[in-house]
Amino acid sequence: MFFRFIILLLSFNLASQEYEITSKNIEIDTELNTINYEHNVVFKSDDIFFTADKLKLNQENESFIAYGLPIKIKFYDGIEFIEGEAEKIEIDSEVLKLSKNVSIIKAGNKINSENMIIKLSNDKS
């Protein structure tokens, strides 16, 4: 089924962390247990914020794959918030993967790569 919304706000729980997703369009596939968000996607949680063109949520394992030209992202690496961009982002409960034209700024230094893997810390203490 395909539903078209001007703005869709949904809250879920990812590894005991709440998040909110906003987009113009949503497609829910109950057979595959997936939700696809398209157009002006905004993902917000305590540790990760990004804007993308598309986002696919797999509800079985609570993993995400986002696409954009580029995706703008801000995330907490356990020490500080880091800003950057990439064309593809994959998130599961423990790992943030950025790929295709990755560029981040950490501690004032710009880092460029084709692929980057960041282990997420669920503990801010």
Q: Which ranges hold each PLM region?
A:
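Sec-dependent signal peptide recognition
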Residues: 1-8
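N-terminal signal peptide c-region/cleavage motif recognized by signal peptidases
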Residues: 11-12
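N-terminal amphipathic/hydrophobic interface segments
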Residues: 16-125
